[in-house]
């Protein structure tokens, strides 16, 4: 018997300026991408909680992430039409054409990814990192070739600067190509500038979607590192998924820990939830978040994280304002030069928390 997501337990949002709908929580296997059992158990739990979006990359374990995801989908007999699968292309080896965003690597790369995933197509293919050496026209045309060949339905970017994404949109307009629909970006309570400030015009002009990664700041927003670094923590192996979050945290530990303790108090006293659940709820409360990717080293962590969906429903203006004051890192809003004053941040305008403008300059 085939399996599919339990849609009664989840909210679904349109991914950018497209007709594709994704669960507000998705699953990514950048953590423990070589663990077959963890992958199988995690996907099963995700489906039970309504998750329909599953993300991987050719670079996760140099292909093993795609292998384990494909194997699990097959073993669980997941209905292909009921889920949204994405992978990302950039680097798979050390040979000259094994990396970057040339037409050769993009077309050959996705064909090899599909073999590992045991799929005929992916719903979304991402450019995993920017490549300023390859002409942007070549990359945009290659992504369109994938769509024309039926190997992917949509394409997106990951960790691209706003100017390069804007250039991609303009190239697609000029050449009458299908533009990207989303950006996979790092966003959480402590990393806000890119999503809330740098991408502001992309959201307004192109309705760009987002697939958020590292919503817990590499686990720091669970609060488990306040007292000490646990022996079984991935930070003991200096593994923060390339986000540099651990160094940032340790360099400013006293300041971060003070905020974490206050946020923990808000979570427990106001919402009867964990700090991690509050942090996840805060991310999906932003209307510019299309989906938030969860990853866990244990299934019980994933199970606890899904409870954040109920916390998200309880976030009101007063709690959101209290969180803003605690974080005190609100990216600056646009400047109204007629009155020479700063407007509220885009996030706070969208959430109608428009009377608070504290934070960074």
Describe each region flagged by the PLM:
Residues 33-36, 57-66, 93, 131-135, ...:
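Acidic-and-aromatic substrate-binding clefts and catalytic sites of carbohydrate-active enzymes
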Residues 3-9, 132, 136-327, 346-361:
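Beta/alpha (TIM)-barrel catalytic core signal, keyed to glycine-rich beta->alpha loops juxtaposed to Asp/Glu
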């Amino acid at each position: 018997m085939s399996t599919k997501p339990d849609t009664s337990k989840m909210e679904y949002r349109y991914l950018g300026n497209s007709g594709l709908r994704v669960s507000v929580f998705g699953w990514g296997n950048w953590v423990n991408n070589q663990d077959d059992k963890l992958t199988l158990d995690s996907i099963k739990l995700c489906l039970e909680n309504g998750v329909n979006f599953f993300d991987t990359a050719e670079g996760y374990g140099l292909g093993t992430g795609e292998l384990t995801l494909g194997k699990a989908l097959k073993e669980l007999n997941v209905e292909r039409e009921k889920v949204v699968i994405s992978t990302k292309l950039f680097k798979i080896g050390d040979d000259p054409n094994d990396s970057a965003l040339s037409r050769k690597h993009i077309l050959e790369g996705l064909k090899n990814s599909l073999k590992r995933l045991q799929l005929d197509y992916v719903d979304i293919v991402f450019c995993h990192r920017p490549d300023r050496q390859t002409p942007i026209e070549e990359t945009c045309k290659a992504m369109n070739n994938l769509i024309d060949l039926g190997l992917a339905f949509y394409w997106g970017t990951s960790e691209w600067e706003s100017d390069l994404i804007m250039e991609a949109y303009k190239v697609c307009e000029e050449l009458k190509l299908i533009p990207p629909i989303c950006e996979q970006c790092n966003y959480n309570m402590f990393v806000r500038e890119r999503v809330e400030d740098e991408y502001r015009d992309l959201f307004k002009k192109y309705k760009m979607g987002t697939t958020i990664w590292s919503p817990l700041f590499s686990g720091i927003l669970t609060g488990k590192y306040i007292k000490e670094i646990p022996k079984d923590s991935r930070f003991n192996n200096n593994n923060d998924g390339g986000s540099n979050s651990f160094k940032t945290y340790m360099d400013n530990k006293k300041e971060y820990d003070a905020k974490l303790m206050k946020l923990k108090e808000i979570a427990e006293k106001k919402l009867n939830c964990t700090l991690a659940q509050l942090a996840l709820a805060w991310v999906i409360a932003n209307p510019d978040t299309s989906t938030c990717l969860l990853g866990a080293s244990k299934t019980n962590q994933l199970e606890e994280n899904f409870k954040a969906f109920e916390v998200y429903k309880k976030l009101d203006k007063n709690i959101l304002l209290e969180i803003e004051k605690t974080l005190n890192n609100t990216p600056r809003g646009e400047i109204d030069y007629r009155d020479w004053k700063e407007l509220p941040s885009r996030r706070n305008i969208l959430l109608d928390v428009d009377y608070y403008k504290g934070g960074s300059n």
